[in-house]
C-alpha cells in the first residue's frame, strides 16, 4: 500500500461499490466458468467448476445472452439477439462438469453468462467477445480531399474539416470544423516511462537515497529521433499522408483522410528498453473533457494485482478526478482499462 495512492478498496463508507467489489465477486464465485476466451465457432459447451463445499451445482441456473456490441459509429447500446435459461448440470461439490447452451449465433459478437443461486441471487456475470467489432467506416464517396504544403505546414481539407500538420515535427497541430477548433494537438508522438524509484532494469533503485519518495512518480524517456518529411499520395478518393522519422523510436505515422472528413491513423514505433508504460500520445486540454463512452472491460479500471472483475460491455461515465478517500465518485474516469476495443470521449469543443 502506498498511502492514499494504494489500490482501491471494496466498498466506500456508504457502501459505494469500488472496483475490488467486482473482483471479489468473480474470484470467490462458487460456480466458476473455466474458459478464458471464445470465438464465433463456439459450440455451446463450457467447462464449469463447482466450488461449493456442500451444494450440488444443479441448485443454480445460468442465463445466457447473445448480444451485438455497437460499432464505433453506433451510438446505441448492446442489442440482445437471443437469450434463455438453462439449469446447471449435476456436479457434486468441488467437482467439474460441462454446461451446454445453444451454439454461437450469426450476428452476435459477444456472449453474456449470468449464474444465479438457489435463492435467486445473481452470483456473477461473465462476458466473452465472439467476433471483432466493426471498425470505423470511412466514406470514400464525394469530393476528393485537397491538400497544400508550405514551408511551415501541410494542410488537408476534406468534408468541411481542415487538418494541419507541422513541417517541423510531422505532428497534427489542429483540426478545424467550420469555425470550431478541435484542441487535439501534438501527436502522435512516442512515449515510454518507468517508475522513478526503479533502476534501468526495473528493480528497486537502492543506490538512490530519494527512491522512496519517487514511488508514485514516473520518468519518461526522450525520443531522440527526428522528422524527415511528409509523403502524400492519393489512394482512390482518399488522401494518405505519411510522416516519416529516423534515428529514434517513432518510425512513421500514416493518416488516411476520406472525402467525408474521417481520418484514420496507423503508426509504427520501436523500443528495446524495460518500461512500465509505452505507446503514443496527443495533447488535449483536460478541462475540455466531459465524459467518455467505451466498449471494453468495465465499468472499473484494473490494477496491478486486480485484473479480475471488470467485464466486456458498453460503458460510459462523466469526467472525474477524485483524490482517494476525499470523495467517493465511482467509477473512476482515469486509469487503465482492460481489453479496450474503442473509446469515444465527449469534448467541450
List where the protein language model places each region.
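Extended substrate-binding grooves/exosites of carbohydrate-active enzymes
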Residues: 1-47, 53-58, 63-78
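Buried hydrophobic-core signal for structured, non-transmembrane domains
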Residues: 45-52, 111-115, 160
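Short, acidic/polar linear motifs in exposed loop/turn regions
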Residues: 52-56, 119, 271-273
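Short beta-strand/loop motifs in extracellular/secreted proteins, especially
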Residues: 58-62, 109, 276-278
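Solvent-exposed strand-loop boundary residues in beta-sheet-rich modules
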Residues: 68-72, 119, 178, 286
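Intrinsically disordered, low-complexity Pro/Gly/Ser/Thr-rich segments with frequent PxxP/GP/PP motifs
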Residues: 73-106
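Beta-strand/loop-rich accessory regions of lumenal/periplasmic or secreted enzymes
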Residues: 104-106, 135-344, 348
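Terminal connector regions
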Residues: 105-137
Amino acid at each position: 500500500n502506498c498511502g492514499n495512492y494504494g489500490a482501491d478498496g471494496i466498498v466506500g463508507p456508504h457502501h459505494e461499490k469500488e472496483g475490488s467489489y467486482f473482483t471479489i465477486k468473480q474470484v470467490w464465485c462458487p460456480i466458476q466458468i473455466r474458459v478464458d476466451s471464445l470465438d464465433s465457432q463456439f459450440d455451446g459447451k463450457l467447462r464449469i467448476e463447482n466450488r461449493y463445499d456442500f451444494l450440488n451445482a444443479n441448485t443454480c441456473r445460468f442465463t445466457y445472452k447473445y448480444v451485438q456490441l455497437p460499432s464505433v459509429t453506433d451510438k446505441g447500446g448492446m442489442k440482445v439477439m437471443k437469450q434463455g435459461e438453462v439449469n446447471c448440470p449435476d456436479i457434486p461439490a468441488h467437482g467439474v462438469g460441462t454446461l451446454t447452451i445453444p451454439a454461437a449465433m450469426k450476428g452476435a459478437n459477444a456472449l453474456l453468462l449470468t449464474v444465479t443461486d438457489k435463492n435467486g441471487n445473481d452470483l456473477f456475470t461473465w462476458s466473452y467477445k465472439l467476433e471483432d467489432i466493426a471498425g470505423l467506416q470511412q466514406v470514400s464517396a464525394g469530393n476528393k480531399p485537397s491538400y497544400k504544403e508550405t514551408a511551415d505546414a501541410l494542410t488537408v481539407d476534406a468534408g468541411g474539416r481542415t487538418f494541419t500538420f507541422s513541417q517541423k515535427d510531422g505532428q497534427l497541430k489542429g483540426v478545424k470544423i467550420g469555425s470550431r477548433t478541435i484542441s487535439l494537438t501534438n501527436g502522435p508522438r512516442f512515449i515510454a516511462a518507468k517508475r522513478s524509484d526503479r533502476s534501468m532494469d526495473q528493480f528497486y533503485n537502492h543506490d538512490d537515497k530519494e527512491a522512496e519518495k519517487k514511488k508514485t512518480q514516473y520518468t519518461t524517456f526522450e525520443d531522440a529521433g527526428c522528422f524527415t518529411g511528409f509523403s502524400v499520395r492519393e489512394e482512390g478518393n482518399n488522401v494518405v499522408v505519411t510522416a516519416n522519422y529516423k534515428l529514434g523510436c517513432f518510425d512513421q505515422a500514416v493518416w488516411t483522410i476520406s472525402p467525408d472528413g474521417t481520418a484514420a491513423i496507423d503508426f509504427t514505433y520501436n523500443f528495446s528498453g524495460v518500461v512500465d508504460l509505452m505507446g503514443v500520445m496527443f495533447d488535449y486540454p483536460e478541462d475540455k473533457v466531459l465524459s467518455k463512452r467505451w466498449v471494453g472491460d468495465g465499468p472499473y479500471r484494473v490494477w496491478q494485482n486486480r485484473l479480475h472483475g471488470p467485464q466486456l460491455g458498453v460503458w460510459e461515465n462523466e469526467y472525474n478526478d477524485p483524490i482517494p478517500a476525499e470523495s467517493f465518485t465511482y467509477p473512476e474516469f482515469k486509469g487503465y482499462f482492460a481489453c479496450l476495443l474503442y473509446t469515444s470521449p465527449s469534448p467541450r469543443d
